[in-house]
């Protein structure tokens, strides 16, 4: 019994470690970390630093973008200017998501206003945002004819908008790569299956012992009953 308890405790520790594992990727161009003055988490007013330009791989139709945002009294005023090749007649779907508390909380904001041209698209959003917001993500889907559930975002434009002090930013803002996320999910699923196997085996042994004790026909009992 002690061996199974130790195994369960070890599995729980591994689960907690994987759940809280962070991957800062400090050199990732997707994120812009503040380097001015430290700020407390959840302050209602925030003015983003000057917009920076980001480059995308040549395979994407989106080449670069600039972003700026201001959070005042808990209200976000953000603008994304995206350069690339667009087809206004085919339409484009834009979604804005937010994440906070090391990825433990996330959600989706209102759809931004879109002004799409052949070489540039401008997206504006003004909405109340939660106090524990860390960064925003603009998802662009270059079609509107297909159903939304089949329309997966093709371009992900991220812009840091709101957060903690500089020391916490490298710990808070991270993103799993697809391979690493797959490995983590596979390990967690394996631990779930192993835990289910251990529980099922324990239940089977307990039920078997109970049945043999109270319901099985033991030879001595059968002989006495026949007598």
Curated annotation (Swiss-Prot):
Residues 22-178 are lumenal. Residues 61-155 form the Ig-like H-type domain. It comes from the Viruses. Residues 1-21 form the signal peptide. GO terms for cellular component: host cell endoplasmic reticulum membrane; host cell Golgi membrane; membrane. It is a single-pass type I membrane protein. GO terms for biological process: symbiont-mediated perturbation of host defense response. InterPro entries: CMV_US. Residues 200-227 are cytoplasmic. Pfam families: CMV_US (PF08001). It is found in: Host endoplasmic reticulum membrane; Host Golgi apparatus membrane. Glycans are attached at residue 61. Keywords: Disulfide bond, Glycoprotein, Host endoplasmic reticulum, Host Golgi apparatus, Host membrane, Immunoglobulin domain, Membrane, Signal, Transmembrane, Transmembrane helix. Disulfide bonds join 69-151. The chain crosses the membrane at residues 179-199. Belongs to the cytomegalovirus US6 family. This is Membrane glycoprotein US8. It comes from Human cytomegalovirus (strain Merlin) (HHV-5). The lineage of its organism: Viruses, Duplodnaviria, Heunggongvirae, Peploviricota, Herviviricetes. The gene is US8.
């Amino acid at each position: 019994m002690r061996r199974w308890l130790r195994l369960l405790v070890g599995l729980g520790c591994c689960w907690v470690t994987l759940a809280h594992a962070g991957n800062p990727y400090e050199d990732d161009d997707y994120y812009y970390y503040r380097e001015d003055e430290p700020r407390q988490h959840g302050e209602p007013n925030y003015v983003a630093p000057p917009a920076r330009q980001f480059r995308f791989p040549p395979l994407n139709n989106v080449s670069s973008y600039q972003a700026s945002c201001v959070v005042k009294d808990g209200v976000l005023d953000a603008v994304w200017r995206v350069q690339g090749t667009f087809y206004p007649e085919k339409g484009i779907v834009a979604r804005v998501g937010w994440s906070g508390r090391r990825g433990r909380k996330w959600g989706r904001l209102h759809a931004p206003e879109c002004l799409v041209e052949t070489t540039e698209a401008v997206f504006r959003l003004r909405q109340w945002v939660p106090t524990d917001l860390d960064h925003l993500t603009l998802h662009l889907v270059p079609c509107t004819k297909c159903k939304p559930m089949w329309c997966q975002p093709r371009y992900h434009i991220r812009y840091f908008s709101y957060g903690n002090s500089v020391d916490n930013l490298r710990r808070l803002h991270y993103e799993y790569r697809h391979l690493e996320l797959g490995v983590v999910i596979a390990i967690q699923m394996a631990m779930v299956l192993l835990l289910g196997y251990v529980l099922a085996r324990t239940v089977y042994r307990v039920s078997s012992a109970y049945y043999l004790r109270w319901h099985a026909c033991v030879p001595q009992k059968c002989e006495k009953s026949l007598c």
